[in-house]
Amino acid sequence: MSLFVAVDNIDKVFSLTDGGEYIALKGINLEIKKGEFVSLIGHSGCGKSTLLNMIAGLDLPSEGIVTLEGQRIKQPGPDKMVIFQNYSLLPWLTVKQNIALAVDEVMKGASAAERKAIVEEHINLVGLGHAVDKRPGELSGGMKQRVAIARALAIRPKLLLLDEPFGALDALTRGNLQEQLMRICEQYQVTAVMVTHDVDEAVLLSDRIVMLTNGPGSNIGGILEVDIPRPRKRMEVVEHPSYYSLRSEIIYFLNQQKRIKKLRAKKTTAIARHGLEKVNLELGYVPLVACAPLVVAQEKGFFAKHGLDEVSLVRETSWRGIVDGIAGGYLDGAQMPAGMPTWLTAGGYREQSIPVVSALTMTRNGNAITLSKKLYDQGIYTAEDFRQLLLASDGDRHTLGMVHPSSMHNLLLRYWLAAHNINPDRDVHLKTIPPAQMVADLKAGTIDGYCVSEPWNLRASMEGAGFSIATDLEIWQNHPGKVLGVREDWAIAHPNTHVALVKALLEACAYCADPNHEMEIRELLATRQYLSTNIDYIHLGDPEGRTCRLGNPVEYSHHLFFGDQFNRPSRTEHLWMMTQMARWGDIPFPRNWVEILERVCRVGVFSTAARELGYDVNYQRQPIALFDGKVFNADDPIAYLNQTVIHRNFTIAEVHLDNPTPAPVFA
């Protein structure tokens, strides 16, 4: 498909009656290929119809241009046909006459017989042969919309534009018309752009779904590729492995936009007290056993002890929620996968650098690679068994879940696969899934396995859904798991608060490491407020240090919360994670990697906090030892990258970092 429509960096500004301005759209860039069906989705007021009107030529952008086949769109015309929700039929004309009026006006060069044939063809196309002589007042809403579709297609437009065409129809009629439109677009390779509020409609009809953020200044928050093959049938679409992940992706985006709107309206003023710049903090977490230090700091009073007496823990269902909260400035800090501060700083989020610092490693270990019971029943007990299965699969796709590109789950899973000569980008399909969804997807058969933190490996085993083929003790013992992350500008604006936060969480980590507190912490985590799960699935660690065995219904977590060199941020470890993210194309490897590590790893903040608590600080650099015996050379990371056998075509580039400045006083 060739480029057909180009929306080039457009803004749309409306003048207000009081002399002010309203910025509806800001910096919209979109390319549409010939024959592609693109849906625009977002909340009311996000500018969907405004964008559609500019593509139609019904309105002009304030800045930027829109082109059709390389020609600038300046006005409406029959090459760009719009179907509105309200049909726009002439009430005194019949079905046939409404369509014929458009055909006669546009196709004056065709003979009367040719025009008549075109009208009849499109009446039959939408199934209205029995109603050709009826006027709009005699038709149902669905029939009227079919007339509008037939009229639009009959004049052979280059581009079909639909503004919520089925929004006013009942569910049955809407479903039938969606099927008809889908069939027509597939048959005639129609290029279409549709505005919709209906998530299922967008997934069913689209090749791509463009998600718009809230206004004012709405922009494209994400574009989803719909990888469901055509021709499509509704019941086959809902059974496709991608259907529910696409649907949940859109719903997550829409819910997140609602939340952002509320947070914008809230604008909590920072409360300074106890010598701290801010005591009312919003800290994000994902419900995992690894969130124990945050829960303990809140419930056992460590936050309050260090002056942070108005802390709110914000529960997110996925790491993407944490990313959005940090990127948007709606969270003061968060529990993060160990690689996320580096990923954000190096431009992993929408290819823009968001400097994030980490002054505390809160957990180590706690991960495992789980495969389905179906694979176990097929005799897949080792990585080599799995590799042989893939070699014999004859093109069958095997999907493995992970939680985020920057997570140790993704990096360790990829490392484990590659070390066993399995290409994680070619031989399997890696899919980002929220942790709490892993077991359900494993049971449903939409994935073959995953790498995730507890309690989801233990739960899969206890419920007979899967088994752990490897734990982190067998891949990289004592690797960093979760860290505390805050934006760099926030840390600069709140230096005393930052130290107090690290002190509170470091004390909480020590509390979690005491075996005498395990049952108390398990009970706290199991409550509805936090993990909301059966306490039997929650274990902080196994004092005997056992790893899982195949067929053993009880598998153990190996979290380490506190100990010598366990909590200090390590530049060497962050460098290893940086090389792995570059290896798999999630970030370019930064030429200025030393600068990035210095900006990310705030050893000084950790040292201050630890010493004020009376803890010793060990600065000795530890070697990184993974199961395959490969040595990580922290002095020459590019040489290390070049020595990897399986990798993507990684790039090396300077990552531009702005000079650090304090965050605004509003959270």
Swiss-Prot record:
Keyword Transport: yes
EC main group: translocase
Membrane topology, record value: Peripheral membrane protein
Domain named ABC transporter: residues: 5-239
Purpose of the protein: Part of the ABC transporter complex CmpABCD involved in bicarbonate transport. Responsible for energy coupling to the transport system.
PANTHER family: BICARBONATE TRANSPORT ATP-BINDING PROTEIN CMPC (PTHR42781:SF8), SPERMIDINE/PUTRESCINE IMPORT ATP-BINDING PROTEIN POTA (PTHR42781)
UniProt name for this protein: Bicarbonate transport ATP-binding protein CmpC
Species: Synechocystis sp. (strain ATCC 27184 / PCC 6803 / Kazusa)
